Amino acid sequence: MRLTAKQVTWLKVCLHLAGLLPFLWLVWAINHGGLGADPVKDIQHFTGRTALKFLLATLLITPLARYAKQPLLIRTRRLLGLWCFAWATLHLTSYALLELGVNNLALLGKELITRPYLTLGIISWVILLALAFTSTQAMQRKLGKHWQQLHNFVYLVAILAPIHYLWSVKIISPQPLIYAGLAVLLLALRYKKLRSLFNRLRKQVHNKLSV
């Protein structure tokens, strides 16, 4: 039984709630002492993990729609991607304002360059910014074939973001390893497309070097 357009609309409502409720919980936890001994780190890790969850959910949609024969599921992919960007922006903002402080924002650029795991994080965020900005149908029509080329960079984020998470924790725990494993699994499901993209990129580089 395939999903109807009305059911997908209700699914989108549920997904919006899934994006909003963690934020409401975080606000409650901040105001009622629900965080741990280092609340700044807790906020950073919570926002980062939530962004990663939405990234993984975004990557899951295409194979799920194909294997479950639910083509209308694709309509939820943009929504999930935008929530991923929103939480990634909260993650970056929490680091800039809470870790560095308002008076030390000038150090942000230096921090992003001198700390490799932060470099991976900001590269991922910039890609997500570009994908969010060009996610509308109007931008898709305007960019034409280049739109898909740009949005294929989500696979790079799927590689960089888990590495950023693993690199940022001082003690390796099961949680970041689980996220990394899920990312690898989802990328493996897109193996044929990734191989095609890699071969195309290699051919383009070879052609440019041959000129």
Swiss-Prot record:
HAMAP family attached to this UniProt entry: MsrQ
Subcellular location: Cell inner membrane
Transmembrane segments: 10-30, 45-67, 82-102, 116-136, 150-167, 171-189
Matching InterPro entries: Fe3_Rdtase_TM_dom, MsrQ-like
Name the UniProt record assigns to this protein: Protein-methionine-sulfoxide reductase heme-binding subunit MsrQ
Topological domain ranges for the Periplasmic compartment: 31-44, 103-115, 168-170
Function as written in the Swiss-Prot or TrEMBL entry: Part of the MsrPQ system that repairs oxidized periplasmic proteins containing methionine sulfoxide residues (Met-O), using respiratory chain electrons. Thus protects these proteins from oxidative-stress damage caused by reactive species of oxygen and chlorine. MsrPQ is essential for the maintenance of envelope integrity under bleach stress, rescuing a wide series of structurally unrelated periplasmic proteins from methionine oxidation, including the primary periplasmic chaperone SurA and the lipoprotein Pal.
Cytoplasmic compartment segments: 1-9, 68-81, 137-149, 190-211
Listed GO CC annotations: plasma membrane
Natural source organism: Escherichia coli (strain K12)
Disruption phenotype: Cells lacking the msrPQ genes display no visible growth defect.
Record keywords, A-Z: Cell inner membrane, Cell membrane, Electron transport, Flavoprotein, FMN, Heme, Iron, Membrane, Metal-binding, Transmembrane, Transmembrane helix, Transport
